[in-house]
Amino acid sequence: MIDLDTVKSHLRVDGDEDDALIQAYTDAAFSTFEQWTNRKLIAEGEPLPEPAGNSIVITKAICQGALLLIGHWFMGREAVVTGTIATEMPMATQALWGPHRWVNL
């Protein structure tokens, strides 16, 4: 949904030694979006399923939120980083993804 070169540019990574890790973070970020929002991502140009239900076509805001989350994970690769404040998800990612979130009542 975001090509590897775009993610690497966002992370300011030139080499290819971290490509597998970056791709794993990218896949995990979109999976996190789907779990957090209770929505199913559909690539642009891909037909919506019938019925559309909780499906959503990926937007620039969704991609930007994913890039921020990928950067967060890339910079802090361990579960706990000494000398920092623990956070669940970057606030900017929540702000970008929040409008798309479906909450089950």
Identify the role of each PLM range.
Residues 1-105:
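Divalent metal-cofactor coordination and adjacent catalytic microenvironments
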